[in-house]
Amino acid sequence: GPLTDGYFAEDVYLNLIKSAKHFFYAATPYLIISDDMTRELCLAAERGVDVRIVTPGIPDKKLVYQTTRSYYAPLVRRGVRIYEYTPGFIHQKQTLCDGETATVGTINFDYRSLYHHFENGVLLHGCGAIGAIGEDFAQIFEVSREVTEQYKGKRSMGLRIIQCILRLFAPLL
């Protein structure tokens, strides 16, 4: 939270990403991440880790949705796979690393959750709930559309300008 020294939630996420050997999955309604988080996700994908991020296919806030999408291209160009959940708005905040460690809580992958708000999360390791989280991710991937390919190419100039402007305000969203 804002009254502590350090950014514990981001540190947990970064450590999980860095330690991943086989896969790292994340589900988050908002993807507005720091350069450090972007770099670690990309490095994990480049070293052969299956990195997948699920965001909503149906937005609750259109500006935040477009800002979230502005983070896709740099990630997918370096091997991260992006999915959008199609049945509705996905509000889960969970991660799964190598089928051994997971997080569940209120912490979004965004500036407000990671740096400004008081949030709660549970770090799980080697317990029965891990299997259930893995099954949940399998179901999520089944009903989500992978949008990785459409973000590998060039985006229109207008869209890039809009996304650059939105990113200026990202810490406020």
Map each language-model feature to its residues:
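PLD/PLD-like phosphodiesterase catalytic module centered on the HKD motif
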Residues: 23-25, 30-173
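Active-site cores of enzymes that catalyze phosphoryl transfer or operate on phosphate-rich substrates
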Residues: 1-12
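Secondary-structure "cap/kink" motif recognition
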Residues: 14-22
